């Protein structure tokens, strides 16, 4: 008989340092990760020099193979390059940068720095032109005035509001420099579940300080707004978007903001979702609300990013609701409104099909919202390289205007000819942790988002190769195995958490770990709403004949592909179909065995990550090596925890055995259900507060 669930502790970091001292091998000096991929993140100050000029001095010209770097001083505006594009031309060993603005020159200098730091040399007659794919490349911070970060796993907020405007921390400019190095040009400073105080004069003066710091790096600031701000801040009786006093208040507030921050970017809005106020409170539409804000911003060039993350507890299928609410409003939004759509139709799950809303709006600007923070993928305890997930979404074809109407093309504005409103957003994984992201390898996701926003055609391999070389070493004996490990990590996470299209099977406690049995105050917050495990099978029936007909929100040929169980991809089959436990999969296995073996693959891959990391120990400083090792061990244990919880729970319905050639559960279902993880939505669990597992 098993004893009750144990708790495990970690001491790998100290072990790593001891191992280093006994091995006799020369290893890099300890590195706390604060410098990110920049080598030295500290900002060099030089009186009278623009940021691009300072970065030009930072380029290792010898490593690059250049004698000098100059800038085209003709003063002629190159229309083809626009305000952010640049070209680099090398004649002999002289490099010339052509760009129209200081921001574009800065991007060019970071391009050259990246080349040098990655060991690439510039050759005679080298010529490259770079123009960003998306006009708006924006980070979304879910930071609160009290310094908590919703779904934040890297400490507290980077923004110390209680110190501003008087005290300015060096991290603010370091943050701006890091973002400029990867092409980010905007940041939303506060949580979409917005505190109305962020629009008060007191806080606007604080925001101004950050805007002034970010401006030389080509970064504009944006704010999330509370739709009920007129009531909260001005004491109006209503926030009805068609009320003349409400309209007047917003016009005056926006004018006030631009008087303080002349290049303010605009607003991000979460309305009528998860308890947030919105225009529907007054019988108005999303378009009514968005347009009121857009009209106030229009004279100043600002934009509204209106989130499509809406769902109601009474709906039989949460995945359908964004299309149901927004498609009828197509063509009704102002031209400076962008509908911000999560990559999938539910909520940042390890794997979802792309949101069908991307292909349903023909005369409305749309943008993608990716989640860089790992809300459902192990927080900052798990190593999961997310670019393959995002690229899977962007490369997906909506078929809205026939073949080639990819999510990337839709959100860049190419499908409907409005590239001036192309936009993409990423919910950050940044906090005041010394390494910024809570996990040293999670920095790759911040880096990858920026590089993808600049050029979505870049491969996951290329971006990761760049990041590893700049952050650790360019030695191929390190880069190749670690790259292989990280490239496999997203698929491994899907396998050990929610394979074959399963989704929303997590614990409600901070969204960490499994909880397929969890109950909640709303049915659409309960895992059973999604997995629908029962004696007759498992999976959500979204087919046209027997289900919710969510497949009809996709254009052909996707509608038929997903609707037919014979053609539906295995990796989404339980997203679209409810199948019997003995259903024969394409592999020839029963569905039950396919689940068992897929979980097992994820478990073994997570264990393999530990071995890979141990094999490159000599290339990594002891500090980062030890911290990453601790977390990889926990990740492998969590993989077992996920498998045990889901398969033992589902076994109640299937009445089938876990195959003998799979690793067997280490805990009973009762033990797992009795475990209580007590964390908030603003933290990741400590490694010593999680279920004990033995790695064989």
Language-model regions, residue ranges each:
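Bacterial Sec-dependent signal peptides at the C-terminal "C-region" and cleavage site
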Residues: 17-27
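Short, well-ordered secondary-structure micro-motifs within conserved domains or adaptor modules
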Residues: 52-83, 95-98
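Catalytic domains of carbohydrate-active enzymes that cleave complex glycans
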Residues: 405-696
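Catalytic-core regions of glycoside hydrolase
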Residues: 163, 201, 235-465, 475
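Bacterial N-terminal signal peptides
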Residues: 9-18
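Bacterial N-terminal signal peptides that target proteins for export
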Residues: 1-10
């Amino acid at each position: 008989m098993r004893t009750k669930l144990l708790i495990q502790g970690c001491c790998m970091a100290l072990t790593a340092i001891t191992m280093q001292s006994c091995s006799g091998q020369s290893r890099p000096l300890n590195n706390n990760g604060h410098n990110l991929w920049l080598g030295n993140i500290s900002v060099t100050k030089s009186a009278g020099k623009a940021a691009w000029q300072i970065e030009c001095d930072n380029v290792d010209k010898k490593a690059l193979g250049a004698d000098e770097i100059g800038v085209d001083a003709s003063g002629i505006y190159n229309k083809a390059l626009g305000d952010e594009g640049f070209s680099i031309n090398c004649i002999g060993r002289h490099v010339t940068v052509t760009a129209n603005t200081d921001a574009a020159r800065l991007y060019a200098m970071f391009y050259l720095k990246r080349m040098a730091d990655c060991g690439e040399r510039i050759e005679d007659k080298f010529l490259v032109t770079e123009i960003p794919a998306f006009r708006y490349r924006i980070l979304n911070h879910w930071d609160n005035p009290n310094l908590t970060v919703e779904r934040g796993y890297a400490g507290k907020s980077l923004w110390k509001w209680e110190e501003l405007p008087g005290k300015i921390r060096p991290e603010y400019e370091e943050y701006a420099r890091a973002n400029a190095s990867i092409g980010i040009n905007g940041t939303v400073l506060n949580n979409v579940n917005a505190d109305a105080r962020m629009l008060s004069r007191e806080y606007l003066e604080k925001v101004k300080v950050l805007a002034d710091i970010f401006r030389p790096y080509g970064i504009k600031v944006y704010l999330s707004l509370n739709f009920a701000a007129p009531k909260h801040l001005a004491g109006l009786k209503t926030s009805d978007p068609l009320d003349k006093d409400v309209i007047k208040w917003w016009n005056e507030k926006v004018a006030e903001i631009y008087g303080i921050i002349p290049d303010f970017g605009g607003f991000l809005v979460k309305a009528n979702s998860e308890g947030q106020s919105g225009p529907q409170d007054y019988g108005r539409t999303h378009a009514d609300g968005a347009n009121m804000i857009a009209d106030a911003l229009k004279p100043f060039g600002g934009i509204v990013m209106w989130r499509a993350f809406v769902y109601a507890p009474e709906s039989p299928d949460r995945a359908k609701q964004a299309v149901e609410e927004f498609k009828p409003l197509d063509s009704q939004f102002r031209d400076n409104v962008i509908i911000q759509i999560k990559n999938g139709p539910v909520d940042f799950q390890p794997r979802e099909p792309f949101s069908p809303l991307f292909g349903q709006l023909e005369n409305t600007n749309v943008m993608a919202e990716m989640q860089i923070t790992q809300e459902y993928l192990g927080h900052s305890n798990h190593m999961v390289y997310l670019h393959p997930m995002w690229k899977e979404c962007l490369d997906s074809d909506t078929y809205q205007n026939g073949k080639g109407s990819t999510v990337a093309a839709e959100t860049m504005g190419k499908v409907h000819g409005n590239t001036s409103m192309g936009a993409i957003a990423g919910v950050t994984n940044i906090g005041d942790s010394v390494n910024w992201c809570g996990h040293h390898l999670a920095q790759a996701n911040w880096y990858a988002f920026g590089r993808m926003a600049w050029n979505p055609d870049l491969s996951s391999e290329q971006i990761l190769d760049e990041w590893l070389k700049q952050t650790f070493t360019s030695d191929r004996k390190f880069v190749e195995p670690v790259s292989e490990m990280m490239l496999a990590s997203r698929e491994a996470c899907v396998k050990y958490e929610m394979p074959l299209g399963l989704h929303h099977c997590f614990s409600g406690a901070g969204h960490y770990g499994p909880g397929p049995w969890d109950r909640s105050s709303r049915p659409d917050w309960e895992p059973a709403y999604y997995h629908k495990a029962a004696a007759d099978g498992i999976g959500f029936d979204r087919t046209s004949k027997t289900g919710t007909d969510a497949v009809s929100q996709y254009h052909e040929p996707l509608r038929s592909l997903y609707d037919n169980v014979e053609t539906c991809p295995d990796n989404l089959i339980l997203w679209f179909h409810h199948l019997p436990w003995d259903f024969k999969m394409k592999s020839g296995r029963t569905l039950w065995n396919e689940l068992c073996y897929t979980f097992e693959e994820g478990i073994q891959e997570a264990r393999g990550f530990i071995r890979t990391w141990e094999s490159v120990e000599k290339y990594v400083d002891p500090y980062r090596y030890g911290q990453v090792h601790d977390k990889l061990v926990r990740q492998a244990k969590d993989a077992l925890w996920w498998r045990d919880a889901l398969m033992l729970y589902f076994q109640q319905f299937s009445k089938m055995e876990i195959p003998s050639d799979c690793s067997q559960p280490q805990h009973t279902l009762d033990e797992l259900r009795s475990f209580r993880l007590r964390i908030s939505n603003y933290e990741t669990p400590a490694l010593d507060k999680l279920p004990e597992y033995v790695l064989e």
